[in-house]
Structures are given as C-alpha cells and as structure tokens.
Amino acid sequence: GKSSATLLISSDPEKGFTQIADSDSLFNYPAYRYSDSIYGGSIWDMVEYNNSLYVSICTGTEDNMPNNNTMQSFALVRGDQNADGTFTWTPVAGDQKKDGARYTFGIDPERTRSGAANLMVFNDYLYIGEYNDEEIALERILFSKTGKNADGQFGGGLDCRFLNANLDQSVNLYRMDKNENMELVVGNSTKMFPNGSLSGLKSGFGRNENQYIWRMEVYDGKLYVGTHDASSLLECFGQFVNGNLLKRTPSEWKDQWSYLKALMKALQTVDPNGNGNPDALAQTIKFSYNFVFKNITVRNMASAIKLLNYLRTAKRGFDLYVTEDGVNFETVTIDGFGDPYNHGLRVFATTDQGLCLGTANPFYGTQIWIQRKAD
C-alpha cells in the first residue's frame, strides 16, 4: 500500500476509527522514516484548542536538511471539522511560500534546532514547547555519522558540531492566542521577538543543557513544565571538566578499576573461532589507525572543547517549573529531584491523590513521584 503518515479519529474506539488526514492532506510534512528527524517522529502531538485540532509534526528529512548539522524544524497545522465529518487542514507554521503558512517551520526563522513541539492548553492559550533533535546529535558522536547518507562506524567519533548547535539554542516556550498570534514566554530575544521573553527567562529556562520541554500538565490551576537534561547522558564528557572525577569515593574508584581489569582480561581472551590468520590482526590495526586519524582532527577537537565548555557548569537531572499566570515561573527542581540520572520528566498523570510524574532514567530505571493534593 501507500507509504504515509495517518491521523485517525473515533468517538467509540471499540467500533473502529476513521482516517481524517494523511501525508498528502498534511502538506507532506510528516517525516516518518528512521533516518528522519527524531527517528521519524512524524505526527508528534495534538490538542484541541478553540474548537480546532492543532497538530505538531516532525518534518526533517535527509532531503530537506538546510545543512549537514541542521534538520528542518517542526510544523504546526490546524484541523477544522466540516459538517460531513471531514477535516480541512491549514498550516500555521510550515512552508510560507508553498503552503501559505503564517509562520515558518519552527515558528521563528532564527530558531533551527527543534525537530518537534509539545502542546498544552492553559488559561486560554496554546503553549508550544520546543524539542531539540538530540537523537541525530548523539548518533553523530556514537557512530561518527556526519552528513547525508553517512553510513557511520562502530565506536563513534568526535564530531560534536550538531550537538553544540543544539546547546547554542536551548529550547523555547511559546504561547499562541485564539487569533494565532505568537508570544515568546521563555527564550532569547530575536528579530521576531526583540524584547525577549514575557517571563524574562532565557532559552532552556537559562540552562543550555535543557534540550526538550518534554512534558507539560495543568493541575490545580497551575501549569507544570518538565524538561530533558542532555548533560546526564553526556557525563562521560562532562566528568572531565565539572569536578566530578575529584569527588569520586574510594569505592567508586575501586569499581572503576575492576571494570578496567575485566576489560583487559576480555581483550586477552583467545577467540575459539579464530582461523589463525595473522592478516586479521593487521586489518584490526589498520582499522584502528584509520579510525584515530579520521576522527582526531582539528575541527573535531575544537567541537569537543566547545562541548566541554557547555558541560563545565551544567547541572545534571531534569528541571521542573510551575506557573499560575502562565508567565512567572517558580522552580521545583533543577537536578531531577536530587538524582542526576533522572535525565527527563517523561510523563504526568493527574489523580484524586495528587499530581504524579514519571522520570526517564535509562541508567537504573524510572521513578514515580507524587505531589499530594492541597487540602
């Protein structure tokens, strides 16, 4: 069949769904292949606002990359239901020339890093939180995949330019009124927003390591905003400049030494499937030689140094902020509730007991926290 993103609707899921949109009706914006932005994030988020359905879409593909270190930013479209149940789609943020969108991809033409956007309605505004493309950025380092159709290699490289560009532009928070006028709530000043943000806060709530506004939730008349902190995953680099190596306990150093001894022992193990061909060793040495001299370049070293400068003062662990008026924010945490391995606030759930949240923690597993309902 036809390859396409699809959007379905149902008033009774047990009786089935009706398709209301596909890639064609969504202006061919959805990027849904693995090589695309955020591993093909496609139709990313949706919310009802002002009697319309607003949908954020990942659009970045290898074919529309502005340059080797930039994917095309997200789109925002509005769906209005017709009398016969079909939907008419209008681009709000997208291709201004071709499709007549009011805003460009990513809303602000100076903002180029966010592959997706998360949506939440609060106080009669639609809040739009940016989500930077960290997947491709980290893939560049892990597998040395740089540029269109790069095959990559096991063991990675040191090309940190994509990641550094993300850190240069940490995430913004916008809000849109019922007339689709945009305001900058959190972010740096640009030509589009010369006076800066309504809150006075810079991009990433003033912290470059905040790379997603991952989840938002309305609870007890307040808007809660949680982030993803990239510095948790980048501690393998950050530990060399943030002082954490000096803070290691004797037990931690003992564990590290045990890991090194285990590695050396594994390297000495004889491969029972080996064929005794000495040329195989020569090929291994040749690969290692080529790998080092391909990756240890002036450009890559400069990009690594720039990355280390960002990580020097980064505070690991997700951030959580709360606001009653949608503009002035209070800080709940900037360090994942004291756990640097809680790198993201992944999900909220409102219950009769209070506001629950689940952390993203790929190191030793998720945690669930609750803020009890006020009496």
Placement of each model-derived feature along the sequence:
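Extended non-catalytic domains of envelope/secretory-pathway proteins
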Residues: 43-45, 52, 56-59, 89-118, ...
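Entry beta-strands of beta-propeller and related beta-repeat scaffolds
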Residues: 1, 48-56, 60, 121-129, ...
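Solenoidal tandem-repeat scaffolds enriched in leucines and small polar residues
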Residues: 1-96, 111-119, 124-126
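Beta-propeller blade signature
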Residues: 3-16, 67-87, 141-181, 238-276, ...
